[in-house]
């Protein structure tokens, strides 16, 4: 008769043993699998289903929440590291007051676009220095050295510093003189015209002004003698923020880009200037054939509007 062998009983593992640690990990893993309904040998869910699982609110609810809670919307924008839209196609004519702050304009025969300034290569290369692009003829380099870029922030200060500089603003004054001496005196009560011309000379390409007398006052057309035009965000901000008495429109006529400054109300100019001396200096300027031809061509172009 065979004797029954006594069964060996497994002694419980001590709390610090390796077996005890493994058993705890296995129980924890089993609990996690049962909680998440995840099996290590089953195929994982699709990426689309995972994305749906993480979508807690709909797009409509999300944007409604942002519109109702401004602070939440600001926090969301701070977390964004990529702009939603860096470029937008535009059509001419265009009112520059409709352009959002921080954007520049790039115009060419291939198309026109409104870009974010910090995404624009030309704005980045210039460093947004108000006088870094000061170029052209007629004493522009000297003008850049003499003036502070803070002058462009004020219509009154810019007009006061520029009105007596007849030689530097020769094209501006000779274009006025082509009408009459009375037209020059009318421009003295519209300081925003000289201010606009100064800003464009400083921040844009070669520009020539043409004037037209209207019921509300003198209207200025700034003609750009270039096929490709870039208007920086700094230039646009100066024009939009300071020309409260004018409507500024960008247009293209016969492949010529132009900015139209139309007065909508009278300006208040209480500055005292030496009108007689300035007018005498203007009449003494050299009216070259080149300038005459530019004035004639510009007036013919403006007459078609």
Swiss-Prot record:
The UniProt regions of compositional bias labelled Basic and acidic residues, in chain numbering, are 1-11
Print the keywords alphabetically. Host membrane, Host nucleus, Membrane, Metal-binding, Phosphoprotein, Zinc, Zinc-finger
Q: Which domain of life is it from?
A: Viruses
GO cellular component, alphabetical, reads: host cell nuclear inner membrane; membrane
**Residue intervals of every CCCH-type zinc finger in the record:** 104-230
Q: Name one GO molecular function term.
A: zinc ion binding
Q: Pfam families from the xrefs?
A: Herpes_UL31 (PF02718)
Q: Carries keyword Metal-binding?
A: yes
Transmembrane stretches in the record are: none
Query: Annotated region Disordered: where?
Result: 1-24
**What does the PTM comment state?**
Phosphorylated at serine residues in the N-terminus. This phosphorylation regulates the localization within the inner nuclear membrane.
The processes (GO biological process) annotated in the record are:
viral budding from nuclear membrane
Q: Where in the cell is it found?
A: Host nucleus inner membrane
Q: What is its main location?
A: host cell
Q: What does this protein do?
A: Plays an essential role in virion nuclear egress, the first step of virion release from infected cell. Within the host nucleus, NEC1 interacts with the newly formed capsid through the vertexes and directs it to the inner nuclear membrane by associating with NEC2. Induces the budding of the capsid at the inner nuclear membrane as well as its envelopment into the perinuclear space.
Family membership, please give it. Belongs to the herpesviridae NEC1 protein family.
HAMAP family, alphabetically?
HSV_NEC1
Q: How does it assemble?
A: Forms a heterohexameric complex with NEC2. Interacts with capsid vertex specific component 2/CVC2; this interaction directs the capsid to the host inner nuclear membrane to initiate budding.
- This protein is called Nuclear egress protein 1
- What is the species listed in this Swiss-Prot or TrEMBL entry? Equine herpesvirus 2 (strain 86/87)
